[in-house]
Structures are given as structure tokens and as C-alpha cells.
Amino acid sequence: MVRVAFTVALLVAVAGVVVPATEYAGVQRSDTAVRDAVERLVAESRALADGNDALPSDAAPARRAVTLELPADGFASAGLRNLSVGPPSTKRSGFDGGPERRGSVVGPDATQFRWRVAGGTEHTEVVDGIRVRPRVGWTLSLSGGRTRLVLRLVAIDGTAVISAEREG
């Protein structure tokens, strides 16, 4: 009887250590997956902008489709609660919500990516040199799972902008 009680106590102690560690690892893994998806979206946007001219949206601008695999809830993974894409805030922005971005003000050709996974903190990454914006009049907010985006290089008031929207 003492052996059974000892075994149960040992299992409870091990579970008390393993479960939080697994949750923490899941949050870290999901944050890394979202960061990788953001980097891929930025790379695809830059490639589109570098190889083409911006045209008005009604003149068949250059386009590219991109499929992102964003984390969903599961064992040892935290689901993406929200990923938003748009212009940076008007205040000085930084990486992961910091007050500054290496002491410089973000330029007008910048994009802000903001995300949070379940159990994690909100992250903000501002990428300078590329304007990725939701389709005019829309918002671009993504959640976990497979998402296919269409990127179009459009000219808006003479400025090159990557217009992003969900396909379909």
C-alpha cells in the first residue's frame, strides 16, 4: 500500500514538472513558427516589389500567392490567437513592444506585424523598407491553420504598396 501511495505521489510530482514545461515549449515553438511566417511574408513581398513595377489596382498588377502554416492548438503547441498586418503605429516602435527601434524612428515605408499565441505575450515587429497593407477598406487579421494570401504590387497615390488579402 505504501508503494502505491509513493508511486502516485511520484507521478503527480513528475506531471507537475512536465506539464508546465510542455506548455512553455509549445508557446516558444508557436512564436517561432509565427516569426518564420512573418519572415516568409516579408521575403515574398520584397521579391514581388523588386521584380515588378507598381500598377493601379485596375490594371492587372503583379501578384503572388503565398501559403502560410500558422500554429493551431494541439498537444505541445499553442495556437495563434491573432496576427495583424498593417502600417506601424504613429509612436516610436520597436521589436517585441520595445519603446524604440535601435534609437531610430520608423520610416514611412514600413509594415507592422503584431501577434500573440495562446499563453504567450504580444509581439510586435516593424519591418522597414516594404509597405504591406490590407486591401483598401479591409483589415488583415489571421488566426491559426493554413492560410493562403494573395499579394499584389499596386500603386496607391504614386506609392508602391503590397496589397495583401486572403485568397477566396
Q: What does each model-found stretch correspond to?
A:
Residues 11-14, 23, 27, 55-59, ...:
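Generic structural signal for short, flexible, solvent-exposed coil/loop and linker residues
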Residues 18, 58, 83-87:
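General N-terminal targeting signals
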Residues 1-50:
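Hydrophobic alpha-helical segments
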Residues 70-168:
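Intrinsically disordered, low-complexity regions enriched in Pro/Ser/Thr/Gly and acidic residues
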Residues 50-74:
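Short, glycine/small-hydrophobic-rich surface segments
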